[in-house]
Amino acid sequence: SPLSYSGGDTEYLTMLKELKPDAVIISTDWSTHAGIACDSMKHGAHAFVEVPLAVSLEELWNLVDTSEATRKHCMMMENVNYGRDELMFLNMVRQGVIGDLLHGEAAYIHCLVTQLGDTRGEGAWRPEYHTRINGNLYPTHGLGPVAQYMNLARGEDHFSRVAAFASPALGRNAYAKKHLPADHRWNNTPFICGDMNTAIVKTQLGRTIVVQLDETSPRP
């Protein structure tokens, strides 16, 4: 029967030492992704990491340095790149059906404010990032497929510049005030991440991509 390792935040290290796996799939909370990936590579395993791969530039460079030092692969598992619709369109692009791609638009838009009332699972930790960062917290679901369509970082074109702007942060504070007790943590911790974040990316060849994030606004 499959073995289970639990009971502490570092039990994965015991698993790495005892099982010596060839590869590790990491689907923990965001703050632990990079650290577990680096430890996995140092123990001889390839690391496959859920989105996002890391939450800081320092973590990203640690991943690069560790991968190069250990000669182990480290891949962010951006699952939307492999969706049926996305792969169909990628195939059409590569066959020349679509023509020259000059502009793309991508987004991660769906309402997650009900997570504010959760005490277990993703809702127990994910809202915290909306109190710490004002930016696009989750760009790659939309940006990943568009980057593939444009063949970015695979030859002559790549990301060159980005400008991002956020709306005011109103929705999460309003939801907490209406639906949660006055002494709840989310009524005593202000949210700073704008309800809508819009970024424009320019590539080296001058192509443009609009990327949006909105996990807060109520939508049908």
Where are these regions (language model features)?
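ADP-ribose/adenylate-binding Rossmann-like module
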Residues: 43-56
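Short catalytic-loop micro-motif centered on adjacent basic/acidic residues
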Residues: 25-26, 47-50, 74-78, 210-213
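Short, solvent-exposed turn/loop segments enriched in Gly/Ser/Thr/Pro and often Arg
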Residues: 29-32, 54-55, 80-83
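NAD(P)-dinucleotide binding in Rossmann-like oxidoreductases
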Residues: 186-197, 201-220
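N-terminal glycine-/serine-/threonine-rich beta1-alpha1-beta2 phosphate-ribose binding loop
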Residues: 1-45, 61-73
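Predominantly a Rossmann-like dinucleotide-binding segment in NAD(P)-dependent oxidoreductases
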Residues: 70-75, 80-191
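Non-transmembrane alpha-helical segments in soluble domains
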Residues: 13-16, 38, 64, 90, ...
